[in-house]
Amino acid sequence: MGLDVSVIRGKDLVCPKCGEVISTISMDNVDSGGRVWYPFLESIGYYVPYDKRTEENDWYGKDMKLTEQQTDKLYKFVKKNDPLCSNEIMGLIALARMEGQDVIINADW
């Protein structure tokens, strides 16, 4: 079984009446994969080895909105390790930053 990773550029959909986030709209996404991703996913707390997994840290198949620091870490990781579709991922991150949008990651293994 392989590791499939999606890097998503998105923005929150906010309720005009109460101001709460209703949903996140996906503006663009880039798919990648491979074992090269495991160390990065573990470093941001997305991937947790099975024996250490709890309900709170089980992100399998779920979207994780990255912080600015995690987004910086993602950009540096992609630039250094050159995973599948690295140029597209770096472009997605740059555009998300220019547009003030979120970078979201989702992985299945």
Segments the model singles out, each with a brief description of its role:
Residues 1-109:
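Acidic (Asp/Glu-rich) sequence patches and key acidic residues
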